[in-house]
Amino acid sequence: MTDNFTCNKTDGDNTDFRYFIYAVTYTVILVPGLIGNILALWVFYGYMKETKRAVVFMINLAIADLLQILSLPLRIFYYLNHDWPFGPGLCMFCFYLKYVNMYASIYFLVCISVRRFWFLMYPFRFNDCKQKYDLYISIIGWLIICLACLLFPLLRTNDDTPGNRTKCFVDLPIRNVNLAQSVAMITIGEVVGFVTPLMIVLYCTWKTALSLQNKYPISQHLGEKKKALKMILTCAGVFLVCFVPYHFSFPLDFLVKSNEIKSCFARRVILIFHSVALCLASLNSCLDPVIYYFTTNEFRRRLSRQDLPDNIQLHTKSYKIASNHATSTVAAELC
């Protein structure tokens, strides 16, 4: 009894620290993530018909990021006020969006990596690949992710707690589930939602890097390979920074909240580690627009409006040609 009381007190001592980390992280992410992803959607829509290079997947990735960003003000409110006055339905929906964003981001980062890899390694086979196929892949991915992520809110309960304080997000209690079933669900989720996508991204990175070692590369192909490797490496970097720590800490956090881990010191370390990992997982909404800017020439060109002077010159030349033609016609008629 005393040990349980001591551990509960230790967990409670971590609460203010964890709330502070969450509030600061989400505040930092909110404005840059919102502006960056809205700009990304505008840019991608503008040159969607000009390229076949994974633009559909990038659009879906930006949409996934916006889903999480739009819920951040409510998360910030909760972690600053330590209370949720907006009802259990909205709490569960925002909680659900977090996981939809995470696994949609993982899915579309994999799609972008595979698309660039295939387009580079098998250009003739995939050169005529239409964007509608990417659209079908995106729709199927959204359906699977949205259905699979329903497990996260279903495994939580939002019963009110004493003291007129309503819990939400990381404080939602876990329902009583058999340990064997819990381990099975976590294992399947980790393998399907994290390990397999990570292996695919690392494989694409490895094979693309090997292709640069060709002794007689054509300069144009070498440039394309370097661009593709840059894109795939950036996707792998975001994957490793944002999602690896979370998927290491998630099973441990689940065991803590299920009271399977009894050591007070271990509980304290795991709760802090999971809080940091959760913040890193949220950073992907802010980092994805950086991927677009530094790895996509069309994105930089349109965002910097470098194509604007060309358009102005084109319209000016057209106007001059039309004016000269009209002048010549009038002169001929007068003669």
Curated annotation (Swiss-Prot):
The chain crosses the membrane at residues 28-48, 54-74, 92-112, 135-155, 183-203, 232-252, 269-289. Residues 49-53, 113-134, 204-231, 290-335 are cytoplasmic. Glycans are attached at N4, N8, N164. It comes from the Eukaryota. GO terms for biological process: negative regulation of interleukin-2 production; T cell homeostasis. Expressed in spleen and, at low levels, in brain. Highly expressed in developing and mature regulatory T-cells. It holds the Pfam family 7tm_1. Gene3D superfamilies: Rhodopsin 7-helix transmembrane proteins. The keyword Chloroplast does not apply. Disruption phenotype: GPR174 deficiency appears to favor regulatory T-cells cell accumulation in specific tissues. Knock-out mice are resistant to inflammatory shock induced by lipopolysaccharide (LPS) and cecal ligation and puncture (CLP). GPR174-deficient B-cells have a defect in CD86 up-regulation. GO terms for molecular function: bioactive lipid receptor activity. It is a multi-pass membrane protein. It is found in: Cell membrane. Keywords: Cell membrane, Disulfide bond, G-protein coupled receptor, Glycoprotein, Membrane, Receptor, Transducer, Transmembrane, Transmembrane helix. Residues 1-27, 75-91, 156-182, 253-268 are extracellular. SUPFAM superfamilies: Family A G protein-coupled receptor-like. The keyword Disulfide bond applies. Its main location: membrane. One of its GO terms (cellular component) is intracellular membrane-bounded organelle. G-protein-coupled receptor of lysophosphatidylserine (LysoPS) that plays different roles in immune response. Plays a negative role in regulatory T-cell accumulation and homeostasis. Under inflammatory conditions where LysoPS production increases, contributes to the down-regulation of regulatory T-cell activity to favor effector response. Mediates the suppression of IL-2 production in activated T-lymphocytes leading to inhibition of growth, proliferation and differentiation of T-cells. Interacts with GNA13. Interacts with CCL21. PANTHER family: G-PROTEIN COUPLED RECEPTOR (PTHR24232), G-PROTEIN COUPLED RECEPTOR 174-RELATED (PTHR24232:SF86). Belongs to the G-protein coupled receptor 1 family. This is Probable G-protein coupled receptor 174. It comes from Mus musculus. The gene is Gpr174.
